[in-house]
Amino acid sequence: MRSLMLLAVLTLCALPAAATDWVQAPGSSLVFAGSYQGEIFNGHFPGFQTRLRFDPANPSAGRLEVDIPMTGVTSGNPDYDEEMRGPAFFDIKRDARARYIAEGFRALEDGRYAADGRLELRGNSQPVTLTFTWQEGEHPTLAGRATVERLAFGIGDGMWADTSMIPAQIAISTRVVFRPAP
Protein backbone atom coordinates (compact mmCIF):
# COMPACT_ATOMS: atom_id res chain seq x y z
CA MET A 1 0.00 0.00 0.00
CA ARG A 2 2.80 2.38 0.97
CA SER A 3 4.49 1.63 -2.38
CA LEU A 4 1.31 2.49 -4.28
CA MET A 5 0.98 5.83 -2.49
CA LEU A 6 4.64 6.65 -3.14
CA LEU A 7 4.19 5.74 -6.82
CA ALA A 8 1.08 7.95 -7.07
CA VAL A 9 2.90 10.92 -5.51
CA LEU A 10 5.92 10.48 -7.78
CA THR A 11 3.68 10.20 -10.85
CA LEU A 12 1.86 13.42 -9.98
CA CYS A 13 5.16 15.22 -9.43
CA ALA A 14 6.40 14.07 -12.83
CA LEU A 15 3.41 15.46 -14.73
CA PRO A 16 4.03 18.77 -16.48
CA ALA A 17 2.37 21.82 -14.96
CA ALA A 18 -0.88 22.74 -16.62
CA ALA A 19 -0.90 25.78 -18.84
CA THR A 20 -2.87 28.71 -17.50
CA ASP A 21 -5.50 30.51 -19.56
CA TRP A 22 -5.25 34.29 -19.56
CA VAL A 23 -7.27 37.17 -21.01
CA GLN A 24 -6.13 40.70 -21.65
CA ALA A 25 -6.50 43.21 -18.83
CA PRO A 26 -6.53 47.04 -18.97
CA GLY A 27 -3.19 48.74 -19.55
CA SER A 28 -2.23 46.80 -22.67
CA SER A 29 -0.93 48.24 -25.95
CA LEU A 30 -0.28 47.18 -29.54
CA VAL A 31 1.78 49.69 -31.53
CA PHE A 32 3.64 49.94 -34.82
CA ALA A 33 6.49 52.09 -36.09
CA GLY A 34 7.03 53.06 -39.69
CA SER A 35 8.37 55.91 -41.74
CA TYR A 36 7.21 57.93 -44.70
CA GLN A 37 9.93 59.55 -46.81
CA GLY A 38 12.31 59.25 -43.86
CA GLU A 39 9.91 60.76 -41.31
CA ILE A 40 9.29 58.26 -38.51
CA PHE A 41 5.77 57.86 -37.20
CA ASN A 42 4.13 55.57 -34.66
CA GLY A 43 0.61 54.30 -34.41
CA HIS A 44 -1.53 52.04 -32.32
CA PHE A 45 -4.43 49.64 -32.60
CA PRO A 46 -6.97 50.42 -29.88
CA GLY A 47 -9.51 47.79 -28.95
CA PHE A 48 -7.38 44.72 -29.64
CA GLN A 49 -8.14 41.65 -27.53
CA THR A 50 -5.75 38.89 -26.51
CA ARG A 51 -6.21 35.37 -25.15
CA LEU A 52 -3.24 33.31 -24.04
CA ARG A 53 -2.58 29.81 -22.79
CA PHE A 54 0.91 29.67 -21.37
CA ASP A 55 3.13 27.78 -18.97
CA PRO A 56 6.79 28.95 -18.96
CA ALA A 57 7.85 25.42 -18.01
CA ASN A 58 6.10 24.01 -21.11
CA PRO A 59 6.11 26.69 -23.84
CA SER A 60 5.38 24.17 -26.58
CA ALA A 61 1.81 23.89 -25.21
CA GLY A 62 1.26 27.64 -25.59
CA ARG A 63 -1.44 29.30 -27.68
CA LEU A 64 -1.88 33.00 -28.44
CA GLU A 65 -4.88 34.62 -30.16
CA VAL A 66 -5.05 38.34 -30.91
CA ASP A 67 -8.09 39.98 -32.49
CA ILE A 68 -7.32 43.43 -33.94
CA PRO A 69 -10.06 45.82 -35.09
CA MET A 70 -8.50 47.86 -37.89
CA THR A 71 -11.13 50.61 -37.90
CA GLY A 72 -9.52 52.47 -35.01
CA VAL A 73 -5.91 52.41 -36.22
CA THR A 74 -4.36 55.78 -35.49
CA SER A 75 -1.02 57.50 -35.88
CA GLY A 76 -2.02 60.86 -34.45
CA ASN A 77 -1.81 62.37 -37.94
CA PRO A 78 -5.31 62.67 -39.48
CA ASP A 79 -3.95 62.56 -43.05
CA TYR A 80 -1.97 59.36 -42.38
CA ASP A 81 -4.93 57.83 -40.53
CA GLU A 82 -7.34 58.43 -43.41
CA GLU A 83 -4.88 56.96 -45.91
CA MET A 84 -4.14 53.92 -43.68
CA ARG A 85 -7.84 53.08 -43.41
CA GLY A 86 -8.33 53.39 -47.18
CA PRO A 87 -8.10 50.79 -49.95
CA ALA A 88 -4.34 51.15 -50.58
CA PHE A 89 -3.45 50.17 -47.01
CA PHE A 90 -5.76 48.41 -44.50
CA ASP A 91 -8.92 48.71 -46.63
CA ILE A 92 -11.19 48.63 -43.59
CA LYS A 93 -14.36 48.70 -45.69
CA ARG A 94 -13.39 45.32 -47.13
CA ASP A 95 -11.79 43.71 -44.07
CA ALA A 96 -12.15 45.51 -40.74
CA ARG A 97 -10.28 42.95 -38.60
CA ALA A 98 -6.89 41.30 -38.41
CA ARG A 99 -6.10 38.16 -36.44
CA TYR A 100 -2.89 36.62 -35.15
CA ILE A 101 -2.79 33.01 -33.96
CA ALA A 102 0.25 31.11 -32.72
CA GLU A 103 0.37 27.60 -31.30
CA GLY A 104 3.37 25.98 -29.67
CA PHE A 105 5.98 28.46 -28.50
CA ARG A 106 9.76 28.00 -28.36
CA ALA A 107 12.01 28.91 -25.44
CA LEU A 108 14.90 31.15 -26.47
CA GLU A 109 17.89 32.31 -24.45
CA ASP A 110 17.74 34.99 -21.75
CA GLY A 111 14.18 34.14 -20.68
CA ARG A 112 12.65 34.98 -24.05
CA TYR A 113 10.16 32.97 -26.06
CA ALA A 114 9.12 32.84 -29.71
CA ALA A 115 5.57 32.42 -30.94
CA ASP A 116 5.62 31.33 -34.58
CA GLY A 117 2.15 32.24 -35.76
CA ARG A 118 0.15 33.48 -38.69
CA LEU A 119 -1.21 36.95 -39.20
CA GLU A 120 -4.43 37.21 -41.20
CA LEU A 121 -4.75 40.69 -42.68
CA ARG A 122 -6.47 42.00 -45.81
CA GLY A 123 -7.45 38.49 -46.86
CA ASN A 124 -3.84 37.28 -46.67
CA SER A 125 -2.30 34.89 -44.16
CA GLN A 126 1.46 35.08 -43.62
CA PRO A 127 3.87 33.69 -41.01
CA VAL A 128 4.94 36.19 -38.34
CA THR A 129 7.14 35.40 -35.35
CA LEU A 130 6.55 37.27 -32.11
CA THR A 131 9.48 37.19 -29.69
CA PHE A 132 8.49 37.99 -26.14
CA THR A 133 9.35 38.03 -22.48
CA TRP A 134 7.01 36.94 -19.71
CA GLN A 135 6.85 38.64 -16.34
CA GLU A 136 5.10 36.62 -13.63
CA GLY A 137 2.87 38.23 -11.02
CA GLU A 138 -0.73 38.87 -10.04
CA HIS A 139 -1.19 40.44 -13.48
CA PRO A 140 1.47 38.81 -15.66
CA THR A 141 2.81 40.79 -18.59
CA LEU A 142 3.90 39.74 -22.05
CA ALA A 143 6.22 42.22 -23.82
CA GLY A 144 6.89 41.35 -27.44
CA ARG A 145 8.17 42.45 -30.82
CA ALA A 146 7.59 41.33 -34.39
CA THR A 147 8.32 42.52 -37.90
CA VAL A 148 5.64 42.53 -40.58
CA GLU A 149 6.45 42.52 -44.29
CA ARG A 150 3.72 44.94 -45.38
CA LEU A 151 3.89 44.14 -49.11
CA ALA A 152 3.20 40.44 -48.43
CA PHE A 153 -0.21 41.56 -47.16
CA GLY A 154 -0.82 44.04 -49.98
CA ILE A 155 -0.42 46.97 -47.58
CA GLY A 156 0.57 50.05 -49.49
CA ASP A 157 -0.01 49.00 -53.05
CA GLY A 158 0.19 51.14 -56.17
CA MET A 159 2.47 54.13 -55.71
CA TRP A 160 2.84 53.20 -52.02
CA ALA A 161 4.64 49.96 -52.93
CA ASP A 162 7.82 52.01 -53.44
CA THR A 163 10.00 50.99 -50.48
CA SER A 164 12.05 54.18 -50.75
CA MET A 165 8.91 56.03 -49.61
CA ILE A 166 7.69 53.53 -47.01
CA PRO A 167 10.01 50.67 -45.95
CA ALA A 168 8.79 47.13 -46.56
CA GLN A 169 9.24 46.15 -42.92
CA ILE A 170 7.00 47.53 -40.19
CA ALA A 171 8.01 47.06 -36.54
CA ILE A 172 5.28 45.90 -34.18
CA SER A 173 5.55 45.96 -30.40
CA THR A 174 3.11 44.95 -27.73
CA ARG A 175 2.75 44.97 -23.99
CA VAL A 176 -0.14 42.86 -22.80
CA VAL A 177 -1.23 42.76 -19.18
CA PHE A 178 -3.20 39.63 -18.28
CA ARG A 179 -5.69 38.37 -15.74
CA PRO A 180 -6.90 34.79 -15.33
CA ALA A 181 -9.54 33.77 -17.85
CA PRO A 182 -13.03 33.39 -16.40
Task: Indicate where each model-derived feature is located.
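Hydrophobic helical h-region of N-terminal Sec-dependent signal peptides
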Residues: 6-12
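N-terminal signal peptide c-region/cleavage motif recognized by signal peptidases
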Residues: 14-16
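Low-complexity, acidic/polar, glycine-enriched regions of mature
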Residues: 19-182
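Positively charged n-region of N-terminal signal peptides that target proteins for export
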Residues: 1-4
